Design a protein with these regions (language model features):
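N-terminal glycine-/serine-/threonine-rich phosphate-binding loop
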Residues: 1-33, 38-56
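A short, charged helix-loop
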Residues: 101-122, 126-165, 223, 228-235
Length: 273
């Protein structure tokens, strides 16, 4: 199972609503917590021990909070390979402690696009993706949690393994984390391209979030899943059983035909081939 003991965690989250679900478990296994900004204040307000990142790094937050966790003592603590003697000697020389767990979610950039925030540029996260990617790269030694919906899985993993995580769990969370940052970057890229009215960018990312599994794919023996982009699907299912891949193709055909009508009146009947 290649278990790794979690001794130290860094927490930096935008959505703090689920912290209460994970903090008791971290306390149970005596896991030291490092945090910053609003996350630090929230953790302290809930009466849990927590070290401010500035106290740990001995370097203050600067640029109005734009630079908080971008520091060698943080990233060195995450990226070091535990079995590499050179890495461990570097840590000793610089008084850096290993960080075994990274709990980070990103600024809600996509949400701010929808409400047309005037401060949208400030929601482009830099420190968060850096922490996530560093931890995800070093999955052999570090656990990364990039989705607040995974707190239950983390607590379950720590309880089963008595304060440790398995390589299977770390690798799964690593794959998920790279998906999170890739999706996030693609949303930012699309927004900038739209600002410049660039219709055919050199690189175009098609990004989506899984809504759910379909009844089946194109054929009954095949599997299918439905993903949505940053835009709303714009449809509601009123009645009937779960939809299949072919059903969604039918819906697309119907909507395409409806869009050709000049008036907002009409009906389309579709029978798929």
């Amino acid at each position: 199972m290649n278990l790794k003991k979690v001794k130290r965690a860094i927490i930096s989250v935008s959505d703090k609503s689920n912290l209460k679900k994970i903090l008791p478990t971290l306390k149970k296994f005596k896991i030291q917590i490092i945090s910053s900004g609003g996350s630090f204040k929230k953790i302290k307000s809930m009466k849990y021990n927590c070290t401010h990142v500035s106290k740990y790094t001995k370097f203050p937050e600067i640029l109005g909070g734009r630079v908080k966790t971008l520091h060698p003592k943080i990233h060195g603590g995450i990226l070091n390979i535990r079995k590499n003697k050179t890495h461990q000697n570097d840590l000793k020389k610089q008084n850096i402690q290993s960080i075994d767990l990274v709990i980070v979610d990103l600024y809600p950039f996509e949400k701010q696009i929808k409400i047309k925030s005037k401060k949208l540029i400030e929601y482009i996260d830099i420190g968060g993706p850096s922490l996530i990617r560093a931890a995800a790269k070093n999955f052999n030694d570090v656990t990364v949690i990039s989705d607040i919906n995974d707190y239950f899985q983390l607590t379950k993993e720590l309880n089963i393994n008595k304060g440790s995580t398995s390589i299977k769990f770390r690798k799964y969370m690593s794959a998920k984390a790279f998906g999170v940052t890739a999706y996030y970057d693609s949303v930012v890229s699309d927004w900038l391209n739209n600002q410049l009215s660039i219709k055919f960018p050199i690189r175009k990312m098609i990004h989506g979030k899984l809504i759910g599994r379909l009844r089946y794919g194109e054929n009954p023996h095949q599997q299918g899943g439905l993903y949505k982009t940053s835009e709303n699907l714009g449809i509601d299912k009123i009645h009937g059983k779960e939809l299949s891949y072919n059903n969604y193709n039918d819906i697309y055909s119907a909507l395409s035909i409806l869009n050709t009508f000049k008036k907002n009146e009409g009906a389309v009947i579709i029978k798929h081939t």
